[in-house]
Swiss-Prot record:
Expression tissues: Component of the acid-insoluble and acid-soluble organic matrix of the aragonitic skeleton (at protein level).
Stretch forming the signal peptide: 1-20
Comp. bias (Acidic residues): 71-90, 118-168
Residues covered by region (Disordered): 49-168
Annotated protein name in UniProt: Secreted acidic protein 1A
Record-level GO cellular component terms: extracellular region
């Protein structure tokens, strides 16, 4: 009788491991995501999430993603990580430095030091250099090659295109 009971327990454990049924030795200090497979955070972290943000939707989202919320319910460790508040605690630009000064001026100075980017801005300079631009429409024949000969005329002097050059 005891042998039969041991066999039943053995096969129950074996069956449980193959089917992925929850084991009684499961870690009780862990919170797992929706499908029950991966550990996201511990109960201690979850308790800080519950204390900081009373909104249940944010609590569940924070538990699933593993994001710790600050005192205002925003992602981060403290008020210093809140992006919409400048350093004096009032609303302001995100790029203010620690003294509350705007860093936009620093960015403008950096752009001036770097110089202007003249990628294809001045077509007049290109034309003055004598470039043969196919997109110029200043009387150039786009069919001309570098020699200046009209490609529509063959070497015998006969016009290759079907136009009537008589002017009629």
């Amino acid at each position: 009788m005891a042998r039969d009971l041991l066999l039943v327990v053995f096969f129950a454990c074996l069956l449980q491991s193959f089917w992925g049924l929850p084991l009684p030795l499961k870690n009780e200090n862990a919170i797992v995501d929706g499908d029950g497979t991966s550990v996201v955070t511990t109960k201690e972290d979850a308790s800080t999430i519950f204390e900081r943000d009373p909104n249940p939707a944010n609590q569940v989202s924070a538990m699933v993603t593993g994001v710790i919320l600050d005192e205002n319910g925003d992602p981060g460790e403290s008020d210093e990580s809140v992006e919409n508040v400048d350093n004096d605690g009032e609303g302001g630009d995100k790029d203010d430095d620690k003294n509350g000064e705007d860093n936009d001026l620093d960015n403008k100075e950096h752009e001036e030091e770097k110089g202007d980017d003249d990628r294809g801005d001045d077509e007049e300079e290109d034309d003055a250099e004598g470039d043969n631009d196919s997109n110029d429409n200043e009387g150039d024949d786009d069919d001309d090659d570098d020699s200046g000969d009209d490609d529509d005329v063959d070497e015998s002097g006969a016009d290759e295109d079907d136009d009537d050059d008589s002017g009629d």
